[in-house]
C-alpha cells in the first residue's frame, strides 16, 4: 500500500511539474508576443499631423517657385523632401512645371516610387533620382534636380567645377560627374528607372551634389532650404567659372571650402528672402 502510494505521489509530482512548465512556457511566450507587438508598434513611424503636412507642403511649393525664380529650373526640373516621420516616403509634385506647383499637386511616394494614396496623376519620369538617393543616404532630407545651362556645360567641358567663393564651399574638392553611358550605353539621358537612379546615387556617394553629363545636376541637403540653397549657388558658381574658362582661377582650397561650408548650413537668410519674393505669386 505504501509503495503504491509513493508511486502515485511521484506521478502526481511529475504531472504537477509538467503542468507548471507548460504554464510557465505559455506565460513566457505570451510575454514575448507582447514585447514583439510593442516593438512592431515602435517600428511603425507615426503619421505626420495635418499641421506638419500643411507646413511642409507650403515649403515645398515655395521651393519649386524659388528654383524657378532663381533660374535653376524652367519648365523642367524638380525638388523633393523626405517625409518628416516616415523615412521610406517622400513628397514631390506631380508632373508639372515647378513655377505652377500648388499644395494640391504634391504627391506622397514610397521608395519604389509608388503613390502611397493611389494617386493616378502623371508623375515625373525621373522620380527615381529621388527614391534611389533616399535609399542610400539617410542623412539626405531633400533633393533638387536641375537642367541649368551652365551646370550642364560644366559637366561636359572637361574642367572640374570647383568652389570659387565662400558661398559654394559645399562643392569641396569637386563634384563627381555621372555619365550614363558607362552603365547603360546609348540612352535618352534620363533617369527613368530604379537601376539608373541607383547608378546615379552610387556616383553621388557622400558628396553634396553631382553633375550629369549632357543632362544637368543634382544637389542634396539636410532640409529643403539646404538643397535649394545649394542648387542656387551651384548655378552661380558654374556661371562665374564659365566666364573665365581657360584662365587661371584661384579656387578655394579644400580646407577653406570646408570652413566656409560649416557657416552656410540651411541658408536661412536666403530662404526667408526668396520665399517672401515668390509666395506673392498666385
Each language-model region and where it sits:
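Boundary at the C-terminal end of the N-terminal hydrophobic targeting segment
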Residues: 30-31, 37
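Glycine-rich flexible loops
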Residues: 18-26, 38-282
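N-terminal secretory signal peptides
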Residues: 1-11, 36
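N-terminal export leaders
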Residues: 11-17
Amino acid at each position: 500500500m505504501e509503495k503504491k502510494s509513493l508511486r502515485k505521489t511521484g506521478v502526481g509530482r511529475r504531472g504537477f511539474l509538467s503542468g507548471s512548465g507548460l504554464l510557465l512556457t505559455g506565460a513566457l511566450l505570451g510575454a514575448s508576443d507582447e514585447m514583439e507587438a510593442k516593438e512592431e508598434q515602435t517600428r511603425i513611424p507615426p503619421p505626420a499631423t495635418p499641421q506638419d503636412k500643411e507646413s511642409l507642403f507650403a515649403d515645398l511649393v515655395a521651393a519649386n517657385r524659388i528654383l524657378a525664380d532663381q533660374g535653376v529650373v524652367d519648365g523642367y526640373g524638380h525638388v523633393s523632401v523626405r517625409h518628416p516621420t516616415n523615412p521610406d516616403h517622400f513628397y514631390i509634385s506631380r508632373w508639372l512645371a515647378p513655377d505652377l506647383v500648388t499644395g494640391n499637386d504634391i504627391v506622397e511616394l514610397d521608395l519604389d516610387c509608388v503613390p502611397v494614396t493611389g494617386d493616378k496623376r502623371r508623375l515625373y519620369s525621373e522620380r527615381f533620382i529621388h527614391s534611389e538617393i533616399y535609399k542610400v543616404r539617410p542623412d539626405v532630407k531633400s533633393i533638387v534636380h536641375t537642367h541649368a545651362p551652365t551646370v550642364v556645360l560644366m559637366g561636359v567641358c572637361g574642367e572640374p567645377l570647383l568652389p570659387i567663393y565662400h558661398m559654394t564651399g559645399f562643392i569641396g574638392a569637386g563634384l563627381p560627374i555621372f555619365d550614363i553611358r558607362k552603365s547603360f550605353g546609348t540612352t535618352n539621358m534620363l533617369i527613368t528607372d530604379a537601376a539608373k537612379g541607383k547608378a546615379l546615387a552610387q556616383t553621388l556617394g557622400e558628396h553634396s551634389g553631382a553633375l550629369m553629363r549632357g543632362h544637368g545636376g543634382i544637389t542634396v541637403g539636410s532640409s529643403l532650404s539646404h538643397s535649394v540653397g545649394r542648387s542656387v549657388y551651384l548655378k552661380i558658381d558654374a556661371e562665374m567659372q564659365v566666364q573665365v574658362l581657360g584662365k587661371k582661377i584661384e579656387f578655394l582650397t579644400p580646407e577653406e571650402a570646408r570652413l566656409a561650408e560649416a557657416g552656410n548650413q540651411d541658408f536661412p537668410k536666403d530662404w526667408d528672402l526668396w520665399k517672401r519674393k515668390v509666395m506673392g505669386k498666385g
